[in-house]
Amino acid sequence: MSHAPGSNEHSNDAYYAHYQSLQLHRHPHGVLEVVMSGEGANRSALATANARMHFELAEIWRDIDRDPDTRVAIIRGEGKGFSAGGDLQLVEDMATDFDVRARVWREARDLVYNVINCSKPIVSAMHGPAVGAGLVAGLLADISIATKTARIIDGHTRLGVAAGDHAAIVWPLLCGMAKAKYYLMLCEPVSGEEAERIGLVSLAVDEPELLPKAFEVAQKLANGSQTAIRWTKYALNNWLRSAGPAFDTSLALEFMGFAGPDVREGVNSLRERRAPDFGASDPWRGQPQPPSDDRAAGDERS
């Protein structure tokens, strides 16, 4: 994915100087570009949500909301795709360390609510794989644009945990409960073209058109009435806020799963590049069973 035309250097102003994993670029008319990229010199690699990236993805929307010079934000990935899944070392730390698990739960909650409550409109530009924490911002964005060949994947059940994060709060609203259950429970990939067809994203375009379209939309939003646009976003996002209890439940169940046996098998299978085997785990094993026919008959005679 080529760099956006006309972009400025990384923003080092007071709002964004502390960001390390996210690259920030200011554009004319109040457009801020947020770029997720690989670590170190390998910027073209998929952006993996390690501990630092996860923290920054949750925090950036508060700073954008406070930034008087930003009217609209674009979030995109660098290199081969939009975003990779969570860093496996972070997943293992969550599985073994309660403090880490509690911290990441709080960040996961904040990421969803901070995107929803950010008063500035957000445009996402997704290409290649779109997975993990980056996908949260990608699908919760006010205008979501994907290439037709993008691969949107909610990988929670493949890892061995419930589909938390943004899944329960936005998938049923965007594409309906039947499609949401199909893709979330089976961990099936969705192409950008199919995502547009079912209503999961706003637009699907050919890859060369992705950034030009994202900036075209952003410029229109930046040039429009800011009170009208922001108040429209606020009102529409009450649909998402009303799903808050479902989201909180899904996130709690997801993070309860990080303390269970399935996530260890999920991590091992990803490291070994094989299908997971969850056959040995059954959370309902050992539950009280109904009485036998003989016992039931005896109860009726007494």
List PLM regions with ranges.
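Conserved CoA-thioester-binding segment of acyl-CoA-metabolizing enzymes
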Residues: 1-78, 113, 291-302
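Crotonase-fold acyl-CoA enzyme core
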Residues: 113-229, 260, 264-268, 274
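C-terminal long alpha-helix characteristic of the crotonase
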Residues: 145-150, 201-249, 255, 259-261, ...
